[in-house]
Amino acid sequence: SETAAEKFERQHMDSYSSSSSNSNYCNQMMKRREMTDGWCKPVNTFIHESLEDVQAVCSQKSVTCKNGQTNCHQSSTTMHITDCRETGSSKYPNCAYKASNLKKHIIIACEGNPYVPVHFDASV
């Protein structure tokens, strides 16, 4: 079955697409990455940077996660990301999203050995 690290990659990594995504991008990617199976995931962030650069965040600044855990890390540089948010008219199975292209610091949770990203916490 899928590991937490693999799930992070499926849900959040899109290294090779340009960061100039639109709502069409979100609608396709949310479906392609299986986040509209059984329900519409309300919000999801895709990161347009190399996996290596995102994994490196695990050794950058430690911050507290939203849930109070202490294994979150904030990227030292800003990263190109796309926020996909469900629109008001979205209704399963016709999930609909709007895209925001942003350049922000990401905050991710890391765990394991090797110490790798397992959860996207926030962007700041």
Curated annotation (Swiss-Prot):
GO biological process: defense response to Gram-positive bacterium
Feature: compositional bias, Basic and acidic residues: 1-13
Entry keyword NAD: no
SMART domains membership: RNAse_Pc
Annotated positions binding substrate: K7, R10, K41, P42, V43, N44, T45, K66, R85
Alphabetically ordered keywords of this record: Disulfide bond, Endonuclease, Hydrolase, Lyase, Nuclease, Secreted
Organs and tissues of expression: Pancreas.
GO molecular function terms listed in the Swiss-Prot or TrEMBL record: lyase activity; nucleic acid binding; ribonuclease A activity
Active site: H12, H119
Subcellular location: Secreted
EC number: 4.6.1.18
Record-linked PROSITE patterns: RNASE_PANCREATIC
GO CC list: extracellular region
InterPro entries registered for this protein in UniProt: RNaseA, RNaseA-like_dom_sf, RNaseA_AS, RNaseA_domain
Summary of the function given for this chain in its UniProt record: Endonuclease that catalyzes the cleavage of RNA on the 3' side of pyrimidine nucleotides. Acts on single-stranded and double-stranded RNA.
Quaternary state and interactors: Monomer. Interacts with and forms tight 1:1 complexes with RNH1. Dimerization of two such complexes may occur. Interaction with RNH1 inhibits this protein.
Family per similarity comment: Belongs to the pancreatic ribonuclease family.
Protein name, as recorded: Ribonuclease pancreatic
Organism: Camelus dromedarius (Dromedary)
